[in-house]
Amino acid sequence: MGTFRTYTLKIQGNDITLKNITIENNSARLGQAVALHTEGDRLVFVGCRFIGHQDTVYTGMAGTRLYFKDCYICGTTDFIFGPSTAWFEGCTIESLINSYVTAASTPQDQAFGYEPMSHWRLSKLPWHHPHCDYSRKKLK
């Protein structure tokens, strides 16, 4: 089936806000299982829960901007991945196994990748597994 066709929810529009919703991909831990697949700019997620195993949240297009506030994201391997710029404020990120949390594929000409902001809570390390030479992440 392939990673990019396993999503529970795919967003292809711009300027969309989701609040207090749970998006879960409950397929078995046998491969990729995307809960959220984004292909829009200026997407906002507030108080949402994203639950899956490998590849839970796909930040799917270079040059797009995503903002996660007070969200819960859990998974197993590289469960936040893709080329978008994404800010995470007050989010709880839970790794269900001792593996990499993110796999950014930030393009060389894009200034930012994944940006944890204030009140960042990460349950386990390691944080970042780059998917290309220019992957960017920032820890505060």
Positions of predicted regions on the chain:
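Sequence-level preference for short, compositionally simple segments enriched
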Residues: 1-140
